[in-house]
Design a protein with these regions (language model features):
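Cell-envelope and extracellular/periplasmic
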Residues: 1-212
Length: 212
């Protein structure tokens, strides 16, 4: 944007904002921050997923995210508007809900060729809901954007392509790329039918992760 465009945005923002915790109100953030951008042209959106959606709304997050994407494409009059989504980093508060949110983000990305997602599960901080090393998250998001929408030869984020239940004590995950871990295979969990997370051992060979 040029200087005149920024000045116009500031005037619109001051008109639209509500100083009484607008971000907590329905459509508050959109009306206060996004609405003033009406009429501008954008190639894509980088979406840093927040944590407010984990409080009971995580199971329907794919529907909410798809609705947001459709709404923004209509608002900016651009059906080809791309979305690059940074998944949530891990945090001690209700970690299962975080996993559900990230799973829903992956579902949306797989169902829309104009949506990609960057995985940040390993970037969590036990003492801070906001990851400290934003550079890593930004780099991953940029690499996924360049790879998916600009044809750049960047390494793909690790994703599970398929899985095989070998027995009631062994599961194999088949990844999209060979997996290399700096600090060994730790932090793996499985979710039981009753909804409980269980720690498990993991061994890695090429693109196959075996959980026991």
């Amino acid at each position: 944007m040029d200087e005149e465009a920024f000045s116009e945005y500031e005037r619109n923002y001051e008109t639209a904002r509500d100083d009484s915790l607008m971000w907590k109100k329905p459509s508050g953030s959109f009306n206060g921050v996004i609405y003033p951008l009406e009429g501008f042209n954008f190639r894509g959106v980088c979406w840093y997923q927040g944590c407010s959606n984990i409080y009971g709304a995580e199971k329907n997050h794919d529907k909410a995210l798809n609705a947001l994407i459709s709404c923004w494409r209509r608002f900016f009059n651009n059906p080809e508007l791309t979305f690059s989504i940074a998944e949530l980093a891990r945090f001690v508060e209700d970690p299962d809900a975080y996993s559900v949110i990230n799973e829903k983000i992956g579902i949306v990305a797989r169902g829309d060729k104009l949506v990609c997602n960057a995985i940040n599960l390993d970037q969590g901080d036990w003492a801070d809901i906001h990851p400290r090393d934003k550079h890593v998250i930004g780099t991953r998001l940029a690499n996924e954007t360049l790879r998916c929408f600009f044809g750049k030869d960047e390494n793909a984020a690790p994703k599970v392509v398929s899985c095989e239940i070998v027995s009631d004590k062994e599961v194999r995950l088949f990844m999209n790329e060979n997996v290399v871990l700096k600090n060994g295979a730790n932090g793996f969990e499985v979710l039981t039918e009753s909804g409980y997370s269980l720690n498990c051992e993991a061994t890695i060979e090429n693109n196959v992760i075996t959980l026991t």
